[in-house]
């Protein structure tokens, strides 16, 4: 019996079976149904790394509650620009998922997306002033028109009882709430997308490592494959390659040798969460409650107490507690970081180490935290939390981008970045948050960079799939409201009224 893929040629090879590759594959099947596509995933199922529901927080990132997307300037003002951009991006994701559901291309949306109000919650006078300023900056905008603000313990308790019960009634607190927020199981969505691909002619290969990549004489790429369990080896030629292997993308991008990959490095940050599966406790909390990050903390370390829906069951999640591991993947190797160091990226990496002492100090402090300290951090958001109701789980790895900078030598960049070869034959995605929630606009950006000639001809189809494509919804309130209603109906999102 042969385990290794025997396919010799493909128009497109997708490396990695996470939400990014699955999304790109779904786009290509819609835009170019006759193209041959092969997907290779090193694990035995799709979406088991960063896309897995317990490896990420599952927040449908729309900047409704994440304070790091709209930080205070030195003068105390808050710019809404980044929050607006992220919200616009998430609206595109909602529209694409709705298109797939409406066309019966994927299964019930209840399996991957549910309504969960998004809240920001802060403690103390300074943080309260900031939150009110943020609310006043966002509220006038179409995409944030439903946002509510309160400093009243009683009102906040109606929104999220667990964060108020047992709290000192004199403590200064403030919260905002957006009732239309969502919780997304990106693992379930990834499985739906890969099932759709497999049912429509895409060759899906699990348990396959892509061990090498080299430029072919015809402008395409030759990839070497290994099936670790059987020890078999294989090869495949592709006209186009997408490296969507999460934390594993950097190594393959470096192996490609394209000039655009030079100077990039990765900084891995691991994380842990507390999880509560007690249904009586979970039933008392229906919100994703985001707070303020500690000084020096990376953006993905903002503390939050979340309602989660995984496999139809409701549970609670709190964290993350950051840590450090040299792995680039949860199922990776401790050698991932040292083996990623190249002559072209060592200077940017050293510059980042020098300029980010706050982050280093934060990670050392987090790694040294005892279990009791972690429980106390939970009680800042859930005062009556009992240690025995929560289990500590390890989340997925987040590899932040290190890149060259003409002034500093190198910078640590939070977020995601599309890297594309000049000839359009290869594309890759590096980075993390907001990540999965913006998979749709990120893959559209990749398509534009790697298929510029085809992209012009795809405009009509993209508009059919996503009626808000190419439109700033924040500047078109009627269309924004119409699409919000339509996507909520398609995705079977329950309406949660304000002030409840």
UniProtKB/Swiss-Prot annotation:
Catalysed conversion reaction: (S)-malate + a quinone = a quinol + oxaloacetate
Keywords associated with the record: FAD, Flavoprotein, Oxidoreductase, Tricarboxylic acid cycle
Gene symbol of the encoding locus: mqo
Covalent S-S links between cysteines: none
Cofactor(s) essential for the protein: FAD
InterPro entries, sorted: FAD/NAD-bd_sf (IPR036188), MQO (IPR006231)
Signal peptide: none
Enzyme superclass (EC): oxidoreductase
EC number: 1.1.5.4
NCBIfam families: mal_quin_oxido (TIGR01320), PRK05257.1-1 (NF003603), PRK05257.1-4 (NF003605), PRK05257.2-1 (NF003606), PRK05257.2-5 (NF003609), PRK05257.3-1 (NF003610), PRK05257.3-2 (NF003611), PRK13339.1 (NF009875)
Organism: Pseudarthrobacter chlorophenolicus (strain ATCC 700700 / DSM 12829 / CIP 107037 / JCM 12360 / KCTC 9906 / NCIMB 13794 / A6)
MF terms in GO: 2-hydroxyglutarate dehydrogenase activity; L-malate dehydrogenase (quinone) activity
Domain of life: Bacteria
Protein name (database record): Probable malate:quinone oxidoreductase
Family from the record: Belongs to the MQO family.
Single biological process term from Gene Ontology: tricarboxylic acid cycle
Metabolic or biological pathway, per its Swiss-Prot or TrEMBL entry: Carbohydrate metabolism; tricarboxylic acid cycle; oxaloacetate from (S)-malate (quinone route): step 1/1
